[in-house]
């Protein structure tokens, strides 16, 4: 299993707050997502993944779901293309979904985002 490069991770208070305030929100079956197209394009898409403690009290389950979300994105990131988008994935289901279900949801979200642009 490969890692997501540090350049593709959304980090920093100003970048995250800009995404949350100016970004467009959407919902999918088990995911809530927010995205923001950067202008001018910087050439790299960045993501952030969050699993609320309210749904999963144990850190082990939260970390498992975050790993699954990151891996699902990493294997399908070419669906976005080189469009320079910041994306937040917020896991919004109360049950632990298997990797294939998460991968399908991430694929549908990425297709929605790329079609809107």
Regions found by a protein language model. Give the residues of each.
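Positively charged, solvent-exposed patches that mediate nucleic-acid binding
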Residues: 1-117
């Amino acid at each position: 299993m490969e890692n997501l490069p540090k350049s593709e991770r959304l980090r920093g208070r100003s970048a995250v707050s800009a995404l949350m305030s100016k970004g467009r929100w959407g919902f999918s079956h088990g995911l809530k997502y927010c995205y923001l197209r950067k202008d001018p394009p910087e050439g790299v898409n960045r993501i952030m993944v969050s699993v609320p403690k309210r749904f999963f009290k144990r850190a082990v389950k939260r970390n498992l779901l975050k790993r699954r979300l990151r891996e699902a994105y990493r294997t399908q990131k070419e669906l976005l293309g080189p469009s320079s988008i910041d994306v937040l994935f917020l896991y919004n289901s109360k049950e632990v979904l298997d990797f294939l279900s998460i991968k399908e949801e991430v694929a549908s979200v990425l297709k929605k985002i790329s079609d809107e642009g």
